[in-house]
């Protein structure tokens, strides 16, 4: 998915609004994913997956940090996310569909917390951005 200059600008502005809440929103998106798509829990057998778990919060922060890195390097996401792509493809062997599920849950989380800012244009640009991130993360599977 190719992000237009407008999409990139919208994504950067939206992510600035997320700001210091990024880790919390990442954890909430993970919780939503685990509740809505229980099979995703199989990738985290060692985690306490209960609401507010320190492990889920910690992983939510990792997700948010990776997305922040992708936003900062939106013009070269393949390089910026290369190590993460290797990890998910070769060590963790995460089914690629799970990136789409988490992307959806993150969009829902952002819409809940930023309703005024989550316009149709922002939704569309963030959706394209998340699809691009998912594509990069699954690129090493081939």
UniProtKB/Swiss-Prot annotation:
Quaternary structure note: Heterotetramer of two alpha chains and two beta chains.
Domain Globin: 2-142
Superkingdom, natural source: Eukaryota
One function term, GO molecular function aspect: oxygen binding
Originating gene: HBAA
Binding site for heme b: 88
Similarity section: Belongs to the globin family.
Keywords, sorted A to Z: Heme, Iron, Metal-binding, Oxygen transport, Transport
Tissues and organs where the protein is expressed, per its UniProt entry: Red blood cells.
Protein name (record): Hemoglobin subunit alpha-A
Functional note: Involved in oxygen transport from the lung to the various peripheral tissues.
Family matches, as InterPro entries: Globin, Globin-like_sf, Globin/Proto, Hemoglobin_a-typ, Hemoglobin_oxygen_transport, Hemoglobin_pi
GO cellular component, one term: haptoglobin-hemoglobin complex
UniProt-listed SUPFAM superfamilies: Globin-like
Any single Pfam family the record assigns to this protein: Globin
Binding site for O2: 59
GO biological process: one example: hydrogen peroxide catabolic process
Organism name: Otolemur crassicaudatus (Brown greater galago)
Transmembrane segments: none
């Amino acid at each position: 998915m190719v992000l237009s200059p407008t999409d990139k600008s919208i994504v950067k502005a939206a992510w600035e609004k997320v700001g210091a809440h990024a880790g919390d929103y990442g954890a909430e998106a993970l919780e939503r994913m685990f509740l809505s798509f229980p099979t995703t829990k199989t990738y985290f057998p060692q985690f306490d997956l209960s609401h507010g778990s320190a492990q889920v919060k910690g992983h939510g922060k990792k997700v948010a940090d990776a997305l922040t890195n992708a936003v900062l390097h939106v013009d070269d996401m393949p390089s910026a996310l290369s190590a993460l792509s290797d990890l998910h493809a070769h060590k963790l062997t995460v089914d690629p569909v799970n990136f789409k599920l988490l992307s959806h849950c993150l969009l829902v989380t952002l819409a809940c917390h930023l309703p005024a800012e989550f316009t149709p244009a922002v939704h569309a640009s963030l959706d394209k951005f998340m699809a691009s991130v998912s594509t990069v993360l699954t690129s090493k599977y081939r």
